[in-house]
């Protein structure tokens, strides 16, 4: 049964993740409505889909987090190889001062996320806004707190939005931003 669910999630997210990555690589700031809405539903139902989008933003390189890696994480988030990959990527992004962001790629993703949130309502807005908050915080953008607050207005229990808001308030930042 578990493999059937993982396969169904892979099949469902393959085209939306592929468009997402293609748009990041090509600096296209808006997704098709169908795929945008599918990602909003996926993020609302599976936080691993949200985490895959975050990975694609903070990695800064399509060779690190391609569509296959995103599908692996979203469909099998507890697989040890996926846990290790996510941990290593996030650890490097936070703690390696030489791990600089691909600013244009990240801004492109934030723009797509904002557009996604505008296409849906209620609980389906929360995670796109939260990922936009996270990406904005990671870049050092003043928009981070606004995105986090918008997400929290919709769901006051959204843990990641609360973490982003707290990080902004405490002036916490990734290592690369400490160098600047």
Q: Language-model segments: what does each one mean?
A:
Residues 1-180:
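Charged, compositionally biased boundary regions
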């Amino acid at each position: 049964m578990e493999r059937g669910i993982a396969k169904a999630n892979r099949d469902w997210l393959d085209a939306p993740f592929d468009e997402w990555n293609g748009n990041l690589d090509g600096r296209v700031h808006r997704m098709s409505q169908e795929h945008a809405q599918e990602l909003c539903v996926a993020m609302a139902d599976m936080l691993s889909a949200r985490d895959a989008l975050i990975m694609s933003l903070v990695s800064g390189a399509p060779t690190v987090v391609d569509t296959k890696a995103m599908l692996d994480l979203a469909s099998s988030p507890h697989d040890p190889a996926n846990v290790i990959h996510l941990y290593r990527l996030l650890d490097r992004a936070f703690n390696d001062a030489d791990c600089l962001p691909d600013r244009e790629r990240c801004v492109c993703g934030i723009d797509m996320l904002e557009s996604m949130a505008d296409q849906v309502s209620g609980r389906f807005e929360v995670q796109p806004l939260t990922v936009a908050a996270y990406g904005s915080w990671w870049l050092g953008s003043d928009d981070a707190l606004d995105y986090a607050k918008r997400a929290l207005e919709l769901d006051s229990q959204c843990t990641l939005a609360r973490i982003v808001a707290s990080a902004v308030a405490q002036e916490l930042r990734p290592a690369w931003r400490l160098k600047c």
